[in-house]
Design a protein with these regions (language model features):
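Metallocofactor- and cofactor-centric catalytic cores in central/energy metabolism, strongly enriched
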Residues: 36, 42, 68
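Helical transmembrane-bundle signal
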Residues: 39, 43-47, 224, 228-231
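Membrane-interface helix-boundary motifs at transmembrane edges
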Residues: 24-31, 83-84, 178, 236-242
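Alpha-helical transmembrane segments of multi-pass small-molecule/ion transporters
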Residues: 1-17, 29, 56-220, 224-228, ...
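Membrane-interfacial loop-to-transmembrane alpha-helix junctions, especially the N-terminal start
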Residues: 33-35, 187, 242, 246
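Membrane-helix exit/interface motif
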Residues: 49-52, 263
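Membrane-interface helix-loop junction between the first two transmembrane segments
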Residues: 20-37, 52-53
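Hydrophobic alpha-helical bundle architecture
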Residues: 233, 238-252, 262-272
Length: 334
C-alpha cells in the first residue's frame, strides 16, 4: 500500500485515468524521448558511482552471468509454450518481448529500493543492458527457421495473409544487422557510457552531477510515468478479442519468470537488493526497443499483439504490484 502512495506511482495512475476517459492530456514525443534518455543517463551515472566504491568484484560477475542466463532461458520457454496457441511468428515476437526488459520498470524499482533503504549493486544497470539483446537475436533465429520451412505460396503478414513467391520467403533477416542495431542502440550506449563516466569520476563526479542527475530524478520519473500511464490506457482497447491464454501469459508469465530469477538468486547467494532487481528485470517486458526491432525483423508478427500485452497488461501490473511484491519476497528469501 505504501508503494501506491509514492508520487511517481500516483502520477502513473493519473495517466491511466486520463487515458481511460480520453483526455487530451499528452506529453509531446520529443519530451518523452528526452525524459527516457535522462532517466537512463541518471541510472548509468548512479550505477557507475556505486561501482567506483565497490569495485568489480566476483559478486558483480556472478550477477551479470545470472542476467545473461535468464535472458536466454526466458524467451526459449516462452516460445516453446506460446507455439501451442499462436503462429510461430507471433510466438517468437511475444517471447522476445517478454524475454527482454523494460528500462522504466527497472528505474522505478531502483527508486523503490532507495525509498525502502534496500542496498543494491550499481552493476545491475549493466545487467539490464545485457538482458535486452539475447531475446531479439533468438526471435530472429526462430523466424528465419520458420521462413525456411514456410510454404512458397503463402505467408502471414501482421495478422493478414499475403501470397508471395518462393524466393521472397527464402530471404532471411541478417543476424549481423540485428546485432549491430542492438549493440549500437542509442539508449544502451548512453546507459553504459554514463556508467563508465560514473566509474571513472567517482565521488567528484557524483558531487558535480548531483543537482542534475540526483535532485531532479524523482520529478523526471513522475513526468515519464505519467506519459506511460497515458500510453498504457490507450493501448488497452487493442486487447479486445485476444486469446485468454495470451492475457493469462501476460499476467502469469512474468510471475513465473520472477520465480526463476528468485531461485537463481538463492542458488548464487545474491544479496536481497540484487535479487529483487533480478526478479523485476525477469518479470518485465520490453515495449520500446524490442517492438521497434521486431517491426522489420518479424513483419509476419502482429505488432498490436506483443505491444498491447507488454504495455497494456504487464507494465501496469509490475509498476503497481510487482515491484513491491518482488522486493518483499527477495528480502524474505535472500
Amino acid at each position: 500500500m505504501q508503494n501506491l502512495l509514492d508520487p511517481a506511482i500516483l502520477f502513473f495512475v493519473i495517466g491511466v485515468l486520463a487515458g481511460a476517459v480520453k483526455s487530451n492530456l499528452e506529453i509531446p514525443p520529443a519530451i518523452s524521448r528526452f525524459l527516457s534518455l535522462y532517466l537512463l543517463m541518471a541510472l548509468g551515472l548512479k550505477g557507475g558511482f556505486a561501482l567506483s566504491h565497490s569495485g568489480l568484484t566476483a559478486n558483480v560477475g556472478i550477477s551479470l552471468m545470472a542476467t545473461i542466463s535468464l535472458a536466454i532461458v526466458i524467451p526459449l520457454l516462452g516460445y516453446w509454450f506460446l507455439r501451442r496457441f499462436v503462429s510461430g511468428f507471433d510466438a517468437a515476437a511475444v517471447a522476445a518481448t517478454y524475454g527482454s526488459v523494460s528500462a522504466v520498470t527497472f528505474v522505478t524499482a531502483v527508486q523503490y529500493l532507495e525509498n525502502q533503504q534496500v542496498a543494491y549493486g550499481g552493476h545491475m544497470a549493466a545487467g539490464m543492458a545485457l538482458m535486452e539483446s539475447p531475446a531479439i537475436i533468438m526471435a530472429v533465429v526462430f523466424a528465419n527457421t520458420l521462413r525456411q520451412k514456410a510454404s512458397p505460396e503463402l505467408i502471414v503478414l501482421g495478422g493478414g495473409v499475403a501470397a508471395i513467391g518462393h524466393q521472397t520467403i527464402k530471404q532471411t533477416v541478417s543476424i549481423g544487422k540485428i546485432l549491430h542495431e542492438s549493440f549500437t542502440d542509442g539508449a544502451q550506449l548512453l546507459l553504459l557510457g554514463a556508467m563508465v563516466v560514473g566509474l571513472i569520476t567517482g565521488d567528484a563526479g557524483q558531487t558535480a552531477m548531483q543537482p542534475f542527475s540526483g535532485d531532479l530524478f524523482k520529478g523526471m520519473l513522475c513526468f515519464f510515468l505519467l506519459d506511460m500511464g497515458l500510453m498504457a490506457a490507450r493501448n488497452l482497447p487493442q486487447l479486445r478479442g485476444k486469446s485468454p491464454v495470451l492475457i493469462a501469459y501476460a499476467v502469469l508469465g512474468p510471475i513465473f519468470h520472477a520465480s526463476l530469477a528468485l531461485g537463481l538468486a538463492f542458488l548464487l547467494n545474491l544479496p536481497a537488493g540484487d535479487g529483487a532487481l533480478l526478479m523485476v528485470l525477469s518479470a518485465s517486458a520490453s515495449y520500446i526497443a524490442v517492438p521497434a526491432v521486431l517491426r522489420y525483423a518479424l513483419p509476419e508478427a502482429n505488432p498490436s499483439l506483443y505491444f498491447s500485452l507488454s504495455l497494456g497488461v504487464t507494465f501496469p501490473l509490475n509498476i503497481l504490484v510487482g515491484i513491491p511484491t518482488y522486493t518483499a519476497i527477495a528480502q524474505a528469501c535472500l
